[in-house]
Amino acid sequence: MALFSPPISSSSLQNPNFIPKFSFSLLSSNRFSLLSVTRASSDSGSTSPTAAVSVEAPEPVEVIVKEPPQSTPAVKKEETATAKNVAVEGEEMKTTESVVKFQDARWINGTWDLKQFEKDGKTDWDSVIVAEAKRRKWLEENPETTSNDEPVLFDTSIIPWWAWIKRYHLPEAELLNGRAAMIGFFMAYFVDSLTGVGLVDQMGNFFCKTLLFVAVAGVLFIRKNEDVDKLKNLFDETTLYDKQWQAAWKNDDDESLGSKKK
């Protein structure tokens, strides 16, 4: 129920600066009552209160504020980067550690097991030479470091000298001897046709002996057609420094002549 202010006295009505004061009462936390102001009726001279207006307070609305995600500090980023680098390095170390090594059933403890190369109770040295050549060819293509844990104990000196000659020298010697015999025969025939000196008489002639040594030396140095290119490369290497020296002096002379002309 609303409370009204006390009646206005006659003394206060006579005062022109007097402002009437009205009191409000709070009925509840959710409703406010606005008291009406009495007004004079022009006909009856009585006052009647106006209807009270009630205003409901708005209900509170829940507002959810989402906090922005906290940015990770730069230190954590650096730590993650270093962790990734360490992981990559670890993977590289693992890959480098898994190096393919030479494997052969006959290669045991850094040497060839000669018992596995035996044929009819004797060691087949040709097979040993072929196996060692294949191993060294593999090492050229896939270099492998030695260690004290797995030392290489095999030495080619254990292979007899006659096995080397039989393997490499005899087949090559047969080719060279056949080539030398053919060249010597045609040279002797050419000399005999020109001078009429026979083969026996040519052996006592200095010119014929010289041609014989030239033929033998040529057969030894030029065993294959590829050897001609090798000899050309060797000749170019022997004259390379001389050519460079002459080119340096030539450039200096050209520069000096150019400066004089200017």
Swiss-Prot record:
Membrane topology: Multi-pass membrane protein
Function of the protein: Light-harvesting-like protein required for biosynthesis of phytylated chlorophylls and alpha-tocopherol in green seedlings. Functions by anchoring geranylgeranyl reductase (GGR) in the thylakoid membrane, leading to the stabilization of GGR activity. Binds chlorophyll a in the thylakoid membrane. Plays a role in the regulation of chlorophyll biosynthesis under light stress and under standard growth conditions.
Tissue expression: Expressed in photosynthetically active tissues (at protein level).
Predominant localisation class: plastid
Source organism of the structure: Arabidopsis thaliana (Mouse-ear cress)
Compartments (UniProt record): Plastid, Chloroplast thylakoid membrane
GO cellular component: chloroplast; chloroplast thylakoid membrane; cytosol; photosystem II; thylakoid light-harvesting complex; thylakoid membrane
Keywords linked to the UniProt accession: Chlorophyll, Chloroplast, Chromophore, Membrane, Photosynthesis, Photosystem II, Plastid, Thylakoid, Transit peptide, Transmembrane, Transmembrane helix
BP-aspect Gene Ontology terms: photosynthesis; positive regulation of chlorophyll biosynthetic process; positive regulation of phytol biosynthetic process; positive regulation of vitamin E biosynthetic process; regulation of DNA-templated transcription
Keyword set includes Transit peptide: yes
Subunit structure: Interacts with GGR. Forms homodimer, and heterodimer with LIL3.2.
Full protein name: Light-harvesting complex-like protein 3 isotype 1, chloroplastic
Entry annotated with the keyword Repressor: no
Residues annotated as transmembrane: 180-200, 202-222
Gene Ontology molecular function: any one: protein-membrane adaptor activity
Effect of disrupting the coding gene: No visible phenotype under normal growth conditions, but the double mutant plants lli3:1 and lli3:2 are dwarf with yellowish green leaves.
Presequence extent in this chain: 1-39
